[in-house]
Amino acid sequence: MCIRDSRGVFVRNIPIDEAIEIFELRATMEELVGRRLAQNITATQQQEMENLVRNMERAVAATDSHAYHLLNLQFHDRLVEMAGNRKLASIYRKLVKEISLFRRLNLAGHNVLPVSAHAHWEILEAIKSGNPDTAGRVLFDHAMNSKARTIENDEQRRRAELPNDPT
């Protein structure tokens, strides 16, 4: 969101190349989060995250993509917060705000929500394994998959905007 004197508030349109860079930064940050949590997540925190994924599954069952999107944002934000690095959390939140539209569009595809919910169980299992390498890799891959969907969605949008050639 940007605020301009005498112009009001508006959402800044992020170009795809900038969004891709942000997804790459997000992946690296999430890898660090996974590594840290694999070493220090508490049973109470695990339970909280499991409850969030159950709520995500309920949103899938209700085909409520808006609720799912909000829960997905909350899931990742809570992981970042639980990692215990305030500066990381601050930078992460700033970056994910910039790509929120892309992330929402990534969840709009056919059968994406059930696959996404399952991926969040995999994230939790990797963290609970206690292996920092595994947890970091799973979170990194999860964010990079989101980047790949963003690129794919952008390519589809561009193809749809091309004029039909009658010849």
Q: Where are the predicted features?
A:
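Conserved amphipathic alpha-helical segments that form helical-bundle/coiled-coil interaction surfaces
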Residues: E18, I22, R26, A43-R104, ...
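Short, surface-exposed linear patches
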Residues: L25-R26, L32-R35, F102-R104, V112, ...
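Short linear motifs at protein or domain termini
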Residues: M1-Q39, T44-Q45, I151-T167
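C-terminal regulatory/effector modules of DNA-binding transcriptional regulators
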Residues: V112-T167
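A generic structural signal for short
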Residues: D64, N111-V112
